[in-house]
A protein has these predicted regions:
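Short S/T/G/P-rich N-terminal loop/turn motif that feeds into the first structured element of a domain
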Residues: 1-68, 72-85
Length: 85
């Protein structure tokens, strides 16, 4: 399943990338490909191909992720994507 996660937070793009890169290895269990678009400082769009939605949801609700979200007041909006052609 392809999804888009739009994250808005009170930090920098570098803050987000540090968190993303630190958790990327763990996430290899549930995704195969991704692209990150920087909308502006404090807002990114992550397009990602999820292979195991249950593991993705576990990662998104982990203590580590909740702590990051609280520290940076992060709000994630998750959209499903479908190829249209």
């Amino acid at each position: 399943m392809n999804i888009c996660v739009v994250s808005t937070f009170d930090g920098t793009t570098d803050d987000y990338m540090k968190m993303f890169n630190a958790t990327k290895e763990k996430a290899a269990d549930f995704f195969t490909d991704y692209d990150i678009g920087i909308i502006r400082e404090g807002k990114i769009a992550l397009m990602i191909h999820i292979t195991d939605m249950e593991k993705f949801q576990e990662a998104m609700s982990s203590e580590e992720m909740q702590a990051w979200d609280a520290k940076f007041n992060c709000v994630d909006e998750v959209y499903s994507l479908e190829l249209m052609n």
